[in-house]
């Protein structure tokens, strides 16, 4: 990019995305898939900035580094989640941006690793005085046992994201089910597994914006149809299969809490946000029991920023999509000012 006099001009902002989220044209430009989160965010950025470019993070990082050096962006909007399908590499991407001394939106390497670790994050949160499920880790090669925790248990990959590998069979009710589920997951993922006590109640989602974060109104997952086969927690299918949600009359809605519960949710969410080193935006997932106990399940350092996530009953309810995107950018600018 050059000025009228031929001098190099810095790009205002670069949208950094996963290679799998679009296609590269013959002229070398990367174009996000239509109706994708990446396209929606890019549209917001181009409405606000004169120069907004897209860079796809390639598994061979040299082309990515060269593209970023050439554009020399004032800030990077980081929407990456993996490298070549490996979600544990999101921290490495943030590390590359740090090494290049490029300001960027979102959580850094330390926070990514903390939040992605479904065991370590619970240990950190428990020290804050927030309730967490009792749990243990089964490493590859470990013997399989419940270690005294009562059934039922939930079994999930330690570093999974987006409910990867979580389905109705993740809920195990005896040692036979536990062994079977561990065997299946070991054949599918090469990582430790977390087994945690199942907390009866409802899923509660709390989004945060900014670095002295505004806590958005909590949202709960509601299953309208009852029955033995009704989902009791959020699975990959529940999140991604519209017909399945229709069949079980599943919806998300704002959760109305009394003043004391609201104070508890706000306080816990802010403390978790900072303890897990989240930045600019994030989401905390809880279970809310019928007795009103708030139990931390996991933190999401880069929750969905598609416009549907800003819907009237979803986590960023009340904030228009362009405003949320701009607030994230401005939070990152303030945090990195002087770099």
Task: For the regions a language model picked out, list residue spans one by one.
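Flexible, glycine/charged-enriched surface loops at secondary-structure junctions
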Residues: 194-196, 279-283, 339
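Active-site nucleotide/adenylate-binding loops and adjacent lid/helix of ATP-dependent enzymes
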Residues: 2-3, 7-17, 68-70, 112-194, ...
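Short acidic, glycine/proline-rich loop/turn micro-motifs
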Residues: 24-28, 108, 164-167, 309-313
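Short, basic/aromatic recognition patches
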Residues: 268-274
């Amino acid at each position: 990019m050059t000025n009228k006099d031929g001098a190099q001009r810095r790009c205002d902002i670069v949208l950094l995305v996963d290679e799998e989220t679009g296609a590269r044209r013959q002229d070398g430009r990367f174009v996000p898939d239509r109706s994708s989160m990446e396209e929606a965010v890019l549209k917001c950025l181009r409405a606000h900035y004169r120069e907004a470019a897209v860079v796809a993070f390639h598994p061979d990082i040299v082309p990515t580094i060269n593209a970023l050096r050439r554009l020399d962006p004032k800030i990077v909007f980081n929407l990456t989640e993996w490298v070549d399908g490996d979600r544990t590499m999101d921290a490495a991407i943030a590390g590359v941006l740090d090494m290049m001394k490029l300001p960027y939106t979102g959580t850094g390497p330390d926070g990514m690793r903390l939040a992605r670790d479904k065991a370590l994050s619970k240990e950190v949160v428990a020290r804050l005085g927030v309730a967490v499920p009792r749990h243990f880790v089964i490493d590859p090669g470990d013997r399989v046992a419940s270690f005294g925790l009562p059934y039922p248990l939930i079994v999930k990959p330690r570093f999974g994201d987006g409910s990867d590998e979580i389905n109705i069979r993740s809920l195990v009710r005896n040692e036979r089910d536990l062994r079977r589920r561990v065997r299946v997951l070991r054949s599918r993922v090469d990582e430790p597994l977390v087994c945690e006590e199942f907390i009866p109640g409802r899923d509660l989602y709390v989004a945060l914006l900014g670095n002295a974060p505004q806590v958005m109104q909590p949202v709960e997952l509601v299953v309208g149809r009852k029955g033995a086969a009704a989902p009791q927690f959020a699975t990959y299918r529940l999140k991604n299969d519209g017909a399945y949600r229709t069949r079980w009359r599943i919806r998300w809605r704002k959760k109305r809490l009394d003043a004391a519960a609201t104070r508890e949710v706000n306080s816990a969410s802010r403390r978790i946000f900072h303890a897990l080193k989240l930045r600019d935006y994030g989401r905390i997932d809880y279970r809310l029991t019928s007795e009103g106990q708030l139990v931390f399940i996991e933190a999401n350092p880069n929750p969905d920023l598609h416009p549907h996530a800003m819907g009237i009953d979803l986590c960023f309810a009340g904030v228009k999509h362009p405003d949320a995107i701009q607030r994230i950018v401005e939070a990152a600018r303030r945090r990195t000012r002087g770099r």
